[in-house]
């Protein structure tokens, strides 16, 4: 009798994806983040579902309904803070995952990489719309400022913004549609993630050395299931420390003030995980230029495979490229810090320099370093 795990039409798919999957024997902890992202997505969908049972998407009651969840619903406070801080953990894992892909040259799997970029955009859109839902001051003004950026599009900008708003300002129609989109997008993300995995399993995983590992594969279970559980424990511990000891550490105090269209907060800023892109947006004085830079700061990932000049796949044996990679990481941290600062001297200048360095590292310095390393190795 054949094993049901290998013969059943449905269980067979799961078996080929998570149990008998041949995986390289040398992949490090940096390969944990894919499974952690899956766990984060499941956590967000479950906590979000329970929050949606009590939330009302009406401008008059949205803020009160969130307060009601925290005060009156059984364990509502922990569900709300797991959802809010779960988003932060999601983005930490997401940026680590993308960073690992860049460092080890995983972008050479072009289909997997491009779907990953689509996933990144979709997750960012979902997180932005979720931030609007509590209808606090920062929710309202963040929605107003970010949606207003679309008015920079020539000819159709103003009409497009009013179409998204459902009126002449951010109001009830905007909140209702944002809630609807925020609810449906995680399921679209799940479908995209399945396609992402499908394409990855067509080629098999990359590994730190960057060379083919077909001759040295081991089954995913039990080796990497156990390894992933370690990463999961670290993730859960970090998340619970955040939720139980300082749940508002990564939030904005202004969001505990109900939305008021007549009173602008002194510093409008998004959640911490968007600050780097926000800093790039603010570093360009022209509105359309800023919007283009904002979109390109993520879209630049799509042309990284084209700009790969090195004859080696990853950066494991390329010290010059390693230096540039960590320079890029430091630059992104600088941009994140600048994004949270007021628009005044010296932050404006630092932001502009960091933005120039971000694009020049990715588009100019990294391809040049690949060529130099090839020459040094006489390739």
Curated annotation (Swiss-Prot):
Cofactor: heme b
Cofactor note: Binds 2 heme b groups non-covalently.
Compartments (UniProt record): Mitochondrion inner membrane
Main location class: mitochondrion
Entry's Gene Ontology molecular function annotations: metal ion binding; ubiquinol-cytochrome-c reductase activity
Keywords: Electron transport, Heme, Iron, Membrane, Metal-binding, Mitochondrion, Mitochondrion inner membrane, Respiratory chain, Transmembrane, Transmembrane helix, Transport, Ubiquinone
InterPro entries reported in the protein's UniProt record: Cyt_b/b6_C, Cyt_b/b6_C_sf, Cyt_b/b6_N, Cytb/b6-like_sf, Cytochrome_b, Cytochrome_b_C_euk/bac, Cytochrome_b_N_euk/bac, Di-haem_cyt_TM
Residues that hold a ubiquinone according to the record: 201
GO (cellular component) term, any one: mitochondrial inner membrane
Residues that hold heme b b566 according to the record: 97, 196
Disulfide bridge map: none
GO biological process, one term: mitochondrial electron transport, ubiquinol to cytochrome c
Pfam families, per database record: Cytochrom_B_C, Cytochrome_B
Domain of life, source organism: Eukaryota
Binding positions for heme b b562 per the UniProt entry: 83, 182
Transmembrane residue ranges: 33-53, 77-98, 113-133, 178-198, 226-246, 288-308, 320-340, 347-367
Other information: Heme 1 (or BL or b562) is low-potential and absorbs at about 562 nm, and heme 2 (or BH or b566) is high-potential and absorbs at about 566 nm.
Function: Component of the ubiquinol-cytochrome c reductase complex (complex III or cytochrome b-c1 complex) that is part of the mitochondrial respiratory chain. The b-c1 complex mediates electron transfer from ubiquinol to cytochrome c. Contributes to the generation of a proton gradient across the mitochondrial membrane that is then used for ATP synthesis.
Family: Belongs to the cytochrome b family.
Name of the protein in its database record: Cytochrome b
Organism of this sequence: Felis silvestris (Wild cat)
């Amino acid at each position: 009798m054949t094993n049901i795990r290998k013969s059943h039409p449905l269980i067979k798919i799961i078996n080929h994806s998570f149990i008998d999957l041949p995986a390289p024997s040398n992949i490090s902890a940096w390969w944990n983040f894919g499974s952690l992202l899956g766990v984060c997505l499941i956590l967000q969908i479950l906590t979000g579902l329970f929050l949606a049972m009590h939330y009302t998407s009406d401008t008059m009651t949205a803020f009160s309904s969130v307060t009601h969840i925290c005060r009156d619903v059984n364990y509502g406070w922990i569900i709300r803070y797991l959802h809010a801080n779960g988003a932060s953990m999601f983005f930490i894992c997401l940026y680590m995952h993308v960073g690992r892909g860049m460092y080890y040259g995983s972008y050479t799997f072009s289909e997997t990489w491009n779907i990953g970029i689509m996933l990144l955009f979709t997750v960012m859109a979902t997180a932005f719309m979720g931030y609007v839902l509590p209808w606090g001051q920062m929710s309202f003004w963040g929605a107003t400022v970010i949606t207003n950026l679309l008015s920079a599009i020539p000819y159709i900008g103003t009409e497009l913004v009013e179409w998204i708003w459902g009126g002449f300002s951010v109001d009830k129609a905007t909140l209702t549609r944002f809630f609807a989109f925020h609810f449906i997008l995680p399921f679209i993300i799940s479908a995209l993630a399945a396609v992402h995995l499908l394409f990855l399993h067509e080629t098999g995983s990359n590994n730190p050395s960057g060379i083919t590992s077909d001759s040295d594969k081991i089954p995913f279970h039990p080796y990497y299931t156990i390894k992933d559980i370690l990463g999961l424990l670290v993730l859960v511990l970090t998340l619970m420390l955040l939720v139980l000891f300082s749940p508002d550490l990564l939030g904005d105090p202004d969001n505990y003030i109900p939305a008021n269209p007549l009173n602008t907060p002194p510093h409008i800023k998004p959640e911490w995980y968007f600050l780097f892109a926000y800093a790039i947006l603010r570093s360009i004085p022209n509105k359309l230029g800023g919007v283009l830079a904002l979109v390109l700061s993520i879209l630049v990932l799509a042309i990284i495979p084209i700009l790969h000049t090195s004859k080696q796949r990853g950066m494991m044996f390329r010290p010059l490229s390693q230096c540039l990679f960590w320079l890029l990481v430091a630059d992104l941290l600088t941009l994140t810090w600048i994004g949270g600062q007021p628009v005044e001297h010296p932050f404006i200048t630092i932001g502009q320099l960091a933005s120039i360095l971000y694009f020049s590292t990715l588009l100019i310095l990294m391809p040049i370093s690949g060529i130099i390393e090839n020459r040094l190795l006489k390739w």
